[in-house]
Amino acid sequence: MFEALSRTEGGGGASVHILQIGDSHTAGDRITGKLRAALQARFGDGGRGVLPPGVPYDGYAPLQVEVTASDWTTTLAPLAGNAGYVRAGVGLTGVQAITVQPGSTLTLRLDTLLPAFVRIEVCGTGPGRLQVAADDEIWTVAFDDGGCRSVRPDRIHRQVELRALDDVLALHAVRLTSAPGGVELSNLGVVGATLRDLAARDQRVVARELAAWRPALIVLAFGTNEGFDDGLDARAYEALLRGQIVRLRRLAPAASLMILGAPDALRNGVVNGCSADGRRSPPPSLAVVRDVQRRVAADVGVAFWDWHGRMGGDCSADRLATRGEPFMLRDRVHFNSAGSDWIGGVLHADLMTAYEAWSARRGGAE
């Protein structure tokens, strides 16, 4: 990924697509939103990136774009759990929009301070057709057997409306990109998700999406929900993680991979816990998950970010929740807005430190 960032920073016109897949920490778009804004401030705005094809849950509020739906049915794939069944027709967003009512619409509106989009990409499966409208520019998209289709407006627009025309259409994702160059960061998170949910995504759909999106970096941000599973099998989890790394490398061979180690999180209702009130402590499986993630990353050559350590280590979730200006919610699992900005800034700073070190080594070699 650093090579791609270097080309972009040098004015080479290359775009850098970062794709983060994970759980509620990713779905909320507050941590990824901070990282996106910071990277785009330095390297340029490559667009909002990939979004679910609808409003997947109440309170959905992605940064940089407003999404509204009218008679538009959006379905979240059931969580895989321990069964791990493959969810046919479900791609990396974990969401399907099944349009059975002609005239149903989905509208995406960019923030006014952002560059206008120059390409609209939709991924789905027919036989139904989709109308894509940006003001008075209108296109009709047919997916047939499935895939991703792009349209390029001739003029500047900040709003796009998708309208179902006929028959049944399954839409998997929507992508908005800006002018060539800059960073595009897509946050594809599902509340409650584990790595098994990524494993359950339809292989054919995922292959088509990754071929179209061409990410420079894929970030895996799972682990919290596995850590609250007292029956976690460490060997099975390690095999699953290794398998998903192999899968992503096969489907996106040009992408770098990074694992965000599971952050600190606390469970309520314990005795003699590490929290200030003694009632909370990390679930035992959380350290197991983190150890597997770190060890596998080192073994297979995947970047690893120590989220747990960078937020303060053991029981930091309690300290961050009880500080003068809290950075975490009272559940000691999720970050609030201020905390998301803080930890997103820490991640950005660490990435830039690594990038500068890489640039210095490359300059010395030349």
Language-model segments: residues:
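Catalytic His-Asp segment of secreted/periplasmic serine-dependent ester chemistry enzymes
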Residues: 203, 264-366
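Short hydrophobic beta-strand that contains or immediately precedes a catalytic carboxylate
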Residues: 18-22
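Surface-exposed patches in mature extracellular/periplasmic domains of secreted proteins
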Residues: 27, 42-54, 257-260, 306-307, ...
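Loop/turn elements at helix/coil->beta-strand transitions in domains of secreted/extracellular proteins
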Residues: 14-17, 181-184, 213-218, 252-257, ...
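Active-site beta-loop-alpha junctions enriched in small/polar residues
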Residues: 190, 223, 262-264, 310
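Short coil-to-helix leader/linker segments, especially the first N-terminal amphipathic alpha-helix
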Residues: 1-7
